[in-house]
């Protein structure tokens, strides 16, 4: 994919977001992860829309309780035990959101997320972060600190033109 040319060799983390729910960010992040895995890259997709996890439905995961929130709540948890292989491709792995916590923003602000990403970088060629809509909550802005590249999803005849102002502001501020 063209995204590979936008990243340096040591850059592995791609954040996918949108302005509001329903624009297709989970669809795009899932297909991006699948495409990279079909190129022979070892890829993990991380469900960081922890208020409204979408990866469980996309990948038909049965164990919805185990995921990144367990690690963020308790960094003593073995992160790699929470990563699940996918049925799609041997190179594709999924780290779902897990149980919806009472304090999502607080969990994402802690340095546990930074440690999780560093651990995943040791095991995977690419880390795709499926995040919450940026126009709804501040979670994605907090997650942005660990990303090397952001993909902003806009859906034709769905994303309002006024929301493009937010996209331009975020780009200008390099967030």
What is each model feature region?
Residues 1-175:
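P-loop NTP-binding module
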């Amino acid at each position: 994919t063209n995204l590979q040319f936008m990243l340096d060799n040591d850059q592995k983390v791609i954040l996918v977001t949108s302005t509001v729910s329903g624009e297709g960010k989970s669809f795009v992040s899932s297909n991006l992860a699948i495409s990279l895995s079909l190129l022979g890259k070892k890829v993990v997709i991380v469900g960081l829309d922890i208020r409204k996890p979408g990866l469980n439905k996309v990948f038909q995961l049965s164990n919805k309780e185990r995921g990144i929130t367990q690690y963020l709540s308790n960094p003593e948890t073995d992160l790699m035990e929470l990563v699940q292989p996918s049925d799609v491709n041997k190179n594709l792995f999924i780290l779902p959101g897990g149980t919806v916590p009472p304090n999502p923003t607080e969990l994402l602000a802690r340095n546990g997320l930074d440690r999780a990403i560093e651990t995943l970088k040791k095991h995977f060629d690419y880390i795709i972060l499926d995040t919450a809509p940026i126009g709804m909550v501040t979670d994605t802005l907090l997650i942005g600190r660990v990303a090397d590249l952001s993909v902003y999803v806009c859906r034709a005849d769905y994303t309002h033109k006024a929301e493009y102002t937010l996209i331009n502001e975020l780009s200008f501020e390099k967030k």
